[in-house]
Amino acid sequence: MTTQTKTSSPIQPSPIEQSPIQQSPIQQSPIQQSPILQSPIQRSPIQQLPIQQSPSISSTSFSNSNNDTNFNSKRLSNSIFPTSTSPVLSPLSPPLQPQPLISTSTSFNINNNNNNNNNNNNNNNNNNNNNNNNNNNNNTPKTTISGATRSSWTKEEERLFVEAYKLYDKDNKKIQEHVKTKTILQVRSHAQKFALKLEKNGIKSLDNIDQLFNQSHAASSSHNLPSHNTPWSNEEHELFLKAIEKYGRGNWKLISTLIKSRNTLQIKNHARIYFDKISQQNGPPSKKTIIEVENNNNYNDQNNNNEQNNNNNNNNNNNNNNNNNNNSFFNGNDNGNNSSYSDNGNGNKSTSSKSDLSNTRSSGSSSSSGSSSSSSSSTISSGGSGGRSSGGSSGRSSGNSKKSSSKSKSKNPTSKPITPIQPKLILPSRNIILSSAFSTPTPTSISTFPKTPTYTTSNYKSSNNPLNRSFGSINNSSSNNNNNNNNNNNNNNNNNNNNNNNNNNNNNNNNNNNNNNNNNNNNNNKPPTKERYLDLNIITQEEMMGCKEYFTGQISKTPDRYIKIRDKIIRQWDSFKPNYLSKTFSRNQIKDCGSDINSIGRVHQFLESIGVINFNAVGNPLNNNDYDRDNNNNNNNKNNNNNNNNNNNNNNNNNNNNNISDLSAILSSAITNRMLENRKTNNPLRKRKIFYDGQWMDQSLLNTTIEHSGNENDKINMATSSTINNVNNSKTSSSSSPTNESSKLYNFEDFSSFPSFDPFTLVECKKYNNPNEQPFTIDVSSNTMIVMDIHSHISSTEVIGMLGGKFNPDTNHITILLAIPCNSISSDIQCDMDPNSQIAAKEMVNSIGLDIVGWYHSHPNFEPIPSLRDIETQTSFQNLFATSSNNNNNNNKSMIEPFIGFIVNPYHKNGLISNFNCITITKQMDETNQYRIPYQLSTSYTPSLNNQYLYQQIDNLFEKYKSYSSRIDLKKTMENGGFTHLDKMISSISSNLILNNNSSSSNNKNNTNESDLINCDEDIIQDDQTELFLTKIKNQFKDFNNNNNNNNNNNNNNNNNNNNNNNNNNKNKNRNEGSRSRSRSRSRSRSRSRSGTRSRSRSRSLDSYSRSRSRSGGNGYVGEKTLPKKHHHQHLHNRHKSNTFNDPDLSDSYMSEVSRSSSDYYNTESSSSMSDIEDDDISEYSDTENYKSFNKNNNNNNHYNNNFLDKPVLQNKPSYQ
């Protein structure tokens, strides 16, 4: 079924009209349409003008004079470049599947102005009479084509439809009589969609239809704003470009304040479509589409078959005579909204707009008068059906329309493959067109760009420039003399350096000369010899080439933005000199010049390379060696590029100095090579670090040391010689002498150099077969063990501290007397000691006559074996404290490292007693020569030497950690038993608590001179004294939890007793404040005194026994169980007596005695250090004979009474087990 279209001149029927089978492929298979029709984007710049602005369109549907067959009603989506065989529909039509053909519809004619005026194409309406007929149609609906056209429903039509729908329900014929502007098919389709909306919104009554109608309008932006289908006008697009330049991309709310006629969603969609077309400039044209380039400025296609000179291909609409011999800036004072009209001699007016990057299209057709045939501009109508040069005229056709393509080839046998012409980019902020000397590849289509103004030689001055900066003209006419004779490129404005391909001097090459020009180029790579001062009112050619990204027409990088960045960096240097101005500091100070910090850094790099900033700056990281490396690299690059480009001209030294492209090559090559060289030499790639638990850590290192999942089988990453050997197979280990191996320090970077070498990998310790093989023997006091145990129990992160004591070089014996907790930066898998805290601990230990003999740290929930990081730290300490020692065998002096390390594991699943491991690092290397092997040491434990200071240390730990964010909630019940963390801590402390007696002191002597200082003749301590000691600690930590206020529970209890009398309330308050303290002293009788301090002290006479035990480093001590059974479980609170614990040492915990101290000490304020102890106190203990006299002389003057050290008499040092 065919229908004859109404045309102005009779046209002979085409073969397609006689044979419906040979219809256009679009008729036969809608799926095989042009790829443009398959684009998912639903809007394009073609939709941005009302239909009424196009003089070549008369109504809302179409007809084609060369094919009277009916086209299916298919929406044209994003047809930016409709081809000759593609049907063009209204861009406002919503998507719809192909509908049946009907007899009533509207139509319009496609008017394609053929570029080849000598060929009269009967397939398209190219006659001017057709244009006049179309102009006289006045958008009157026609009934000549049997194809329904989809168009948007206006508000009035929607209102009429709702009224008719309420009256007639689903009677579409009556509804169509009510809405006379729509066909029965359109009404039926709209009624189906409307019924779905009613069902979706749950509206069953026809009386509630108005509610849906109001919601649909409220969902849109506003009644006063145009719908999404309304094309954007010139003014709206101009405001859009200005807002993008002012606020940047993404700030849609701010942009909507400037474009008041659009809401944020419409602006966002418009920006998406706009930037999508801009992004297409960098990619090749689609393989499925033959892109037809619109020539709004009468750019002549290089494959045009007209046999005319290029000088005749001028723009008849704009009368712009492009000078092909000069490239310079044009005067940018044109108003972008002005439009000019010119009569083309045929009665039709062609419209051209100067607005930057607007979506207007020149409509109508233009033809030259006389016999000379001039190419007319191909036009796109705003309604989406603009005229194109048809297949016969330009040889273009749809990629899928093979028949039409062959038809055009038969009429144009000499047509060549079409290459899209690259237009000039336009800077929307200043209306600047950059010359081809530094233009970048631009879009494959200029249909999204307006007319290009002419070049001028005058300097550009922007009205928006407050400093009236001028851009110097650029002379780059060395290769433009052949443009008029160039058969491939007819217009210099379209070439973008493509015209230079046929010349001997290639401006796009980075290096245009051979090795004879290296001397001139190397001068530019040398460091600046003097400081330069730029005129802030102009932009030099050197700046344009060094920072050319700001002069290529990018929306986000404009000359204005470059000026702001450059001026701010120069001002920063003026206020910062002579100190070095770094990129980081500059970027932090520049906030309103875009978010691309890398581009700001490149501007900084350029200004620094030419001597504008950081000239002779203090702390400048650049040196002459860097420039020498750059020169060598540039020379090598020049040699390679010269061989590839065949640039064998040896007499171009002077030209190179004046060539802007060479200057760009020199600057970009120097900057690029410098950045690459610095990356290779100074900035090796590092693993990404994240901030975890107060510490910057490698992301790959997290959860690698231990995976504590709460199951019985915890996965611990252990390192053995075999596993480390497998890790380092890729790296050849170099053999080194034993001297170098012993003195080698292992840094964190050493471990990171291996692909999978984790510095937190745990390494099993080896054990000595015989205790006599140990490098030294060790005694550890009970107060040292208790401090380390409590310190590790109350923190979920690793803790760290120093160990104070004495080393006897004659016997190679270490006595550890004190543990000093230190501040640290901790996480659950690593811990770094605060240097200031470490220095303070050393000074305090030295002030009382002791030395630093070791350090300790905790592994909260994994085995107490060292990691590679611990081995590194221990090795460094041992090398620091290394000293000479006499060998007992041959009396030869050898180096010994008297520095040991303790690792505490408080929380494990093998019992309640904390695991302690004493280690040293030997000089023996592992199989891979990567680290020294750690060994486990056996230790002996001695009684506490100063219980008063032990109380003070425990109190300081409580005060310090009660507000710590990662503290342990001691009130929380443990997972593997019915007891709390506090019970577990008390149980572990009781195993380390050792007191003295003097029953056998007269018969035994301690082998260590430092501990054998005191003779004791005090009374025997009662058995229940140990219970009092543990009870005091338990009462102190009973409210230690992870709440911000430790006294909340007590305060709540007080609130329940508000009805009591005042005396009872006062008593409760005193208890809650924790102000009650007791000081007990007992010889034959006991007396109590209360003071305002919180601490409680008890002193009793010494017991009649003392015990020293050795530990093998496991789950308890090795020794006989000598305590009576009546003390079984007494170190725990009585209510848990019925609980059964698996720890074998729990029932036989060894209790120490607490030495006597005066109550005067507890009336003084607690101090966190022992700096108030006089230096002479310890020095007086040089021997035991004068101790009694020293004690009698100082008993009345010293408030410590018994001084720092108590008077325990130690037993003989036990044998190692």
Swiss-Prot record:
Domain called HTH myb-type: residue spans: 145-199, 225-279
Alphabetical GO biological process terms: proteolysis
DNA-binding keyword on record: yes
DNA-binding region(s), residue ranges: 172-195, 252-275
CDD domains in the record: MPN_2A_DUB, SANT
SUPFAM superfamilies: Homeodomain-like, JAB1/MPN domain
Segments passing through the bilayer: none
Location(s) in or outside the cell: Nucleus
GO molecular function, one term: metallopeptidase activity
Domain MPN stretches: 778-921
SMART domains, per the entry: JAB_MPN, SANT
Positions of short motif JAMM motif: 857-870
Biased composition (Low complexity): 8-73, 82-91, 99-139, 296-382, 438-454, 475-525, 632-661, 1041-1067, 1155-1171, 1187-1204
Entry keyword annotation includes Cell inner membrane: no
Compositionally biased spans, kind Polar residues: 140-152, 455-474
Stretches assigned to the SWIRM domain: 525-624
List of residues binding Zn(2+): H857, H859, D870
Residue ranges with Basic residues bias: 1077-1099, 1124-1138
Protein name: Myb-like protein H
